[in-house]
Amino acid sequence: MLLWMVLLLCESMAEAQELFPNPELTEFTNSETMDVILKCTIKVDPKNPTLQLFYTFYKNNHVIQDRSPHSVFSAEAKEENSGLYQCMVDTEDGLIQKKSGYLDIQFWTPVSHPVLTLQHEATNLAVGDKVEFLCEAHQGSLPIFYSFYINGEILGKPLAPSGRAASLLASVKAEWSTKNYSCEAKNNISREISELKKFPLVVSGTAWIKSNMLPIWLPASLLGGMVIAAVVLMYFFKPCKKHARPETPTLKEPDSFLYVSVDNQRYK
Protein backbone atom coordinates (compact mmCIF):
# COMPACT_ATOMS: atom_id res chain seq x y z
CA MET A 1 0.00 0.00 0.00
CA LEU A 2 2.75 2.41 0.93
CA LEU A 3 4.69 1.56 -2.18
CA TRP A 4 1.63 2.21 -4.31
CA MET A 5 1.16 5.68 -2.77
CA VAL A 6 4.79 6.58 -3.42
CA LEU A 7 4.51 5.51 -7.03
CA LEU A 8 1.30 7.51 -7.44
CA LEU A 9 2.91 10.62 -5.97
CA CYS A 10 5.92 10.30 -8.24
CA GLU A 11 3.66 9.92 -11.26
CA SER A 12 1.66 13.00 -10.25
CA MET A 13 4.82 15.06 -9.84
CA ALA A 14 6.13 13.89 -13.20
CA GLU A 15 2.88 14.94 -14.84
CA ALA A 16 3.04 18.28 -13.05
CA GLN A 17 6.59 18.86 -14.27
CA GLU A 18 5.32 18.48 -17.81
CA LEU A 19 2.68 21.17 -17.34
CA PHE A 20 5.11 23.76 -18.74
CA PRO A 21 8.75 23.84 -19.89
CA ASN A 22 11.46 26.19 -18.69
CA PRO A 23 10.65 29.84 -19.38
CA GLU A 24 12.53 32.03 -21.83
CA LEU A 25 13.68 35.54 -20.92
CA THR A 26 13.76 38.07 -23.76
CA GLU A 27 14.45 41.81 -23.92
CA PHE A 28 12.91 44.73 -25.78
CA THR A 29 13.88 48.40 -25.85
CA ASN A 30 11.41 51.21 -25.25
CA SER A 31 11.98 53.60 -28.15
CA GLU A 32 10.91 56.62 -26.11
CA THR A 33 12.74 56.08 -22.83
CA MET A 34 15.42 53.63 -24.06
CA ASP A 35 14.56 51.45 -21.04
CA VAL A 36 14.84 47.70 -21.41
CA ILE A 37 11.67 45.60 -21.11
CA LEU A 38 12.22 42.03 -19.91
CA LYS A 39 9.54 39.46 -20.68
CA CYS A 40 9.39 36.00 -19.15
CA THR A 41 7.66 33.76 -21.69
CA ILE A 42 6.40 30.24 -21.13
CA LYS A 43 4.39 27.78 -23.19
CA VAL A 44 1.48 26.38 -21.20
CA ASP A 45 -0.03 22.98 -21.96
CA PRO A 46 -3.32 23.55 -23.82
CA LYS A 47 -4.89 20.95 -21.55
CA ASN A 48 -4.46 23.34 -18.60
CA PRO A 49 -5.51 26.77 -19.91
CA THR A 50 -6.56 27.93 -16.45
CA LEU A 51 -3.20 27.15 -14.85
CA GLN A 52 -2.21 30.06 -12.59
CA LEU A 53 1.49 30.95 -12.82
CA PHE A 54 3.65 33.42 -10.90
CA TYR A 55 6.82 35.18 -12.03
CA THR A 56 9.95 36.25 -10.17
CA PHE A 57 12.81 38.29 -11.67
CA TYR A 58 16.45 38.19 -10.61
CA LYS A 59 19.52 40.28 -11.27
CA ASN A 60 22.88 38.75 -10.38
CA ASN A 61 20.96 36.10 -8.40
CA HIS A 62 19.18 38.73 -6.28
CA VAL A 63 15.40 39.22 -6.43
CA ILE A 64 14.47 42.50 -8.13
CA GLN A 65 10.77 41.76 -8.63
CA ASP A 66 9.14 39.41 -6.18
CA ARG A 67 6.63 36.70 -7.02
CA SER A 68 3.70 38.18 -8.92
CA PRO A 69 1.37 37.33 -11.83
CA HIS A 70 3.16 39.91 -14.02
CA SER A 71 5.47 38.41 -16.62
CA VAL A 72 7.14 41.73 -17.54
CA PHE A 73 9.88 43.75 -15.82
CA SER A 74 11.26 47.15 -16.85
CA ALA A 75 14.92 48.04 -16.28
CA GLU A 76 15.88 51.71 -16.49
CA ALA A 77 18.71 52.45 -18.90
CA LYS A 78 21.42 53.16 -16.34
CA GLU A 79 24.93 51.85 -16.17
CA GLU A 80 24.40 50.49 -12.66
CA ASN A 81 21.56 48.30 -13.96
CA SER A 82 23.96 46.21 -16.02
CA GLY A 83 24.15 42.55 -15.02
CA LEU A 84 22.87 39.00 -15.44
CA TYR A 85 19.07 38.74 -15.48
CA GLN A 86 16.91 35.66 -14.95
CA CYS A 87 13.27 34.84 -14.34
CA MET A 88 11.50 32.02 -12.52
CA VAL A 89 8.00 30.65 -13.03
CA ASP A 90 6.15 28.64 -10.40
CA THR A 91 2.67 27.35 -9.80
CA GLU A 92 0.25 28.82 -7.31
CA ASP A 93 1.06 26.18 -4.72
CA GLY A 94 4.81 26.62 -5.35
CA LEU A 95 5.37 22.92 -5.99
CA ILE A 96 6.66 23.47 -9.51
CA GLN A 97 9.43 26.05 -10.07
CA LYS A 98 11.33 26.53 -13.28
CA LYS A 99 13.99 29.10 -14.13
CA SER A 100 15.10 30.61 -17.40
CA GLY A 101 18.65 30.92 -18.59
CA TYR A 102 20.75 34.02 -17.85
CA LEU A 103 20.47 37.11 -20.01
CA ASP A 104 23.49 39.42 -19.93
CA ILE A 105 22.40 43.05 -20.29
CA GLN A 106 24.91 45.90 -20.39
CA PHE A 107 23.97 49.56 -20.28
CA TRP A 108 26.65 51.83 -21.75
CA THR A 109 27.03 55.55 -21.15
CA PRO A 110 28.58 57.59 -23.99
CA VAL A 111 31.90 59.21 -23.18
CA SER A 112 31.75 62.93 -22.41
CA HIS A 113 33.79 65.72 -24.03
CA PRO A 114 37.32 65.34 -22.60
CA VAL A 115 39.21 68.19 -20.92
CA LEU A 116 42.88 68.60 -21.86
CA THR A 117 45.54 70.40 -19.81
CA LEU A 118 49.30 70.83 -20.19
CA GLN A 119 51.53 70.94 -17.13
CA HIS A 120 55.19 72.01 -17.03
CA GLU A 121 57.61 73.62 -14.58
CA ALA A 122 59.76 75.71 -16.94
CA THR A 123 58.62 79.27 -17.68
CA ASN A 124 60.12 79.21 -21.18
CA LEU A 125 60.00 75.74 -22.70
CA ALA A 126 63.17 74.49 -24.36
CA VAL A 127 63.95 71.34 -26.32
CA GLY A 128 64.22 68.40 -23.93
CA ASP A 129 62.10 69.89 -21.13
CA LYS A 130 59.52 67.56 -19.58
CA VAL A 131 55.81 68.29 -20.02
CA GLU A 132 52.74 66.32 -18.92
CA PHE A 133 49.58 66.04 -21.01
CA LEU A 134 46.46 65.33 -18.92
CA CYS A 135 43.16 64.21 -20.51
CA GLU A 136 39.99 63.57 -18.50
CA ALA A 137 36.43 62.51 -19.42
CA HIS A 138 34.04 63.07 -16.52
CA GLN A 139 31.37 60.70 -17.84
CA GLY A 140 31.26 57.49 -19.83
CA SER A 141 31.28 53.76 -19.26
CA LEU A 142 34.66 52.25 -18.48
CA PRO A 143 37.06 51.33 -19.87
CA ILE A 144 37.91 54.62 -21.58
CA PHE A 145 40.84 54.73 -24.01
CA TYR A 146 42.82 57.97 -24.31
CA SER A 147 45.06 59.16 -27.15
CA PHE A 148 47.15 62.33 -27.39
CA TYR A 149 47.87 64.21 -30.61
CA ILE A 150 50.12 67.10 -31.64
CA ASN A 151 50.03 68.56 -35.13
CA GLY A 152 47.79 65.63 -36.13
CA GLU A 153 50.28 62.94 -35.08
CA ILE A 154 49.64 60.56 -32.20
CA LEU A 155 52.00 60.65 -29.23
CA GLY A 156 52.85 57.19 -27.96
CA LYS A 157 50.18 54.50 -27.67
CA PRO A 158 46.53 54.75 -26.54
CA LEU A 159 46.17 54.58 -22.76
CA ALA A 160 43.44 52.74 -20.83
CA PRO A 161 43.73 53.70 -17.15
CA SER A 162 41.41 52.28 -14.51
CA GLY A 163 39.97 55.72 -13.77
CA ARG A 164 38.60 58.56 -15.86
CA ALA A 165 41.86 60.42 -16.54
CA ALA A 166 45.11 59.63 -18.33
CA SER A 167 48.43 61.46 -18.39
CA LEU A 168 51.38 61.31 -20.76
CA LEU A 169 54.89 62.51 -19.84
CA ALA A 170 56.94 63.61 -22.85
CA SER A 171 60.11 65.51 -23.77
CA VAL A 172 59.61 68.74 -25.71
CA LYS A 173 60.63 68.74 -29.38
CA ALA A 174 61.50 71.78 -31.48
CA GLU A 175 58.81 71.00 -34.06
CA TRP A 176 56.07 71.22 -31.41
CA SER A 177 56.47 74.97 -31.12
CA THR A 178 53.09 76.75 -31.56
CA LYS A 179 51.50 73.59 -33.03
CA ASN A 180 47.97 72.39 -32.21
CA TYR A 181 47.59 69.60 -29.68
CA SER A 182 44.51 67.65 -28.50
CA CYS A 183 43.36 64.40 -26.90
CA GLU A 184 40.70 61.79 -27.68
CA ALA A 185 38.53 59.78 -25.29
CA LYS A 186 36.80 56.62 -26.56
CA ASN A 187 34.76 53.80 -25.04
CA ASN A 188 32.72 50.93 -26.53
CA ILE A 189 29.94 53.11 -27.91
CA SER A 190 31.29 56.62 -28.58
CA ARG A 191 34.35 58.82 -29.01
CA GLU A 192 34.99 62.50 -28.33
CA ILE A 193 37.88 64.88 -29.07
CA SER A 194 38.97 67.76 -26.87
CA GLU A 195 39.31 71.36 -28.01
CA LEU A 196 42.44 72.21 -29.98
CA LYS A 197 45.09 74.13 -28.06
CA LYS A 198 48.31 75.86 -29.07
CA PHE A 199 51.55 74.43 -27.75
CA PRO A 200 53.79 77.09 -26.15
CA LEU A 201 56.70 78.61 -28.03
CA VAL A 202 59.78 76.39 -27.81
CA VAL A 203 63.08 78.32 -27.59
CA SER A 204 66.35 76.98 -28.99
CA GLY A 205 69.31 76.08 -26.80
CA THR A 206 71.27 79.31 -27.57
CA ALA A 207 68.26 81.54 -27.04
CA TRP A 208 67.45 79.69 -23.83
CA ILE A 209 70.98 80.27 -22.48
CA LYS A 210 70.91 83.97 -23.40
CA SER A 211 67.47 84.54 -21.93
CA ASN A 212 68.33 82.71 -18.73
CA MET A 213 71.85 84.13 -18.28
CA LEU A 214 70.79 87.73 -18.89
CA PRO A 215 69.16 88.18 -15.46
CA ILE A 216 72.34 86.81 -13.86
CA TRP A 217 75.02 88.70 -15.84
CA LEU A 218 73.24 92.03 -16.14
CA PRO A 219 73.46 92.95 -12.42
CA ALA A 220 77.03 91.64 -12.27
CA SER A 221 78.14 93.70 -15.28
CA LEU A 222 76.47 96.82 -13.90
CA LEU A 223 78.19 96.33 -10.56
CA GLY A 224 81.56 95.82 -12.26
CA GLY A 225 81.10 98.98 -14.31
CA MET A 226 80.30 101.00 -11.20
CA VAL A 227 83.44 99.73 -9.45
CA ILE A 228 85.66 100.62 -12.43
CA ALA A 229 84.11 104.08 -12.70
CA ALA A 230 84.71 104.69 -9.00
CA VAL A 231 88.38 103.68 -9.31
CA VAL A 232 88.88 106.01 -12.29
CA LEU A 233 87.28 108.91 -10.48
CA MET A 234 89.43 108.33 -7.42
CA TYR A 235 92.56 108.22 -9.54
CA PHE A 236 91.99 111.44 -11.47
CA PHE A 237 90.27 113.52 -8.84
CA LYS A 238 92.24 112.64 -5.69
CA PRO A 239 93.44 115.80 -3.78
CA CYS A 240 97.07 116.89 -4.45
CA LYS A 241 99.43 117.77 -1.52
CA LYS A 242 100.65 121.37 -1.57
CA HIS A 243 104.46 121.76 -1.52
CA ALA A 244 106.43 124.99 -0.83
CA ARG A 245 107.70 126.62 -4.01
CA PRO A 246 111.52 126.31 -4.19
CA GLU A 247 113.47 129.54 -4.15
CA THR A 248 115.70 130.44 -7.11
CA PRO A 249 119.34 130.10 -6.06
CA THR A 250 121.54 133.26 -6.22
CA LEU A 251 125.26 133.46 -6.74
CA LYS A 252 127.33 134.58 -3.83
CA GLU A 253 129.38 137.65 -4.57
CA PRO A 254 132.70 136.46 -3.13
CA ASP A 255 132.72 133.27 -5.18
CA SER A 256 132.10 135.08 -8.38
CA PHE A 257 134.91 137.61 -7.81
CA LEU A 258 137.33 134.88 -6.86
CA TYR A 259 136.59 132.99 -10.07
CA VAL A 260 137.24 136.04 -12.22
CA SER A 261 140.37 136.92 -10.43
CA VAL A 262 141.83 133.47 -10.93
CA ASP A 263 141.12 133.53 -14.61
CA ASN A 264 142.67 136.90 -15.10
CA GLN A 265 145.89 135.85 -13.48
CA ARG A 266 146.11 132.68 -15.61
CA TYR A 267 146.07 134.39 -18.94
CA LYS A 268 148.28 137.36 -18.26
UniProtKB/Swiss-Prot annotation:
Residues 17-215 are extracellular. It comes from the Eukaryota. The keyword Ubl conjugation does not apply. The chain crosses the membrane at residues 216-236. It is a single-pass type I membrane protein. It holds the Pfam family Ig_C17orf99. Disulfide bonds join 135-183. The lineage of its organism: Eukaryota, Metazoa, Chordata, Craniata, Vertebrata. Glycans are attached at residues 180, 188. Residues 1-16 form the signal peptide. Interacts with class II MHC. Residues 237-268 are cytoplasmic. Keywords: Cell membrane, Disulfide bond, Glycoprotein, Immunoglobulin domain, Membrane, Receptor, Signal, Transmembrane, Transmembrane helix. One of its GO terms (molecular function) is protein phosphatase binding. The keyword Oxidoreductase does not apply. Residues 114-194 form the Ig-like C2-type domain. It is found in: Cell membrane. Acts as a MHC class II receptor. When stimulated on its own, does not play a role in cytokine production or the release of cytotoxic granules by NK cells and cytotoxic CD8(+) T cells. Does not act as an Fc receptor. GO terms for cellular component: external side of plasma membrane. InterPro entries: Ig-like_dom, Ig-like_dom_sf, Ig-like_fold, Ig_Fc_receptor, IL-40-like_Ig. This is Fc receptor-like protein 6.
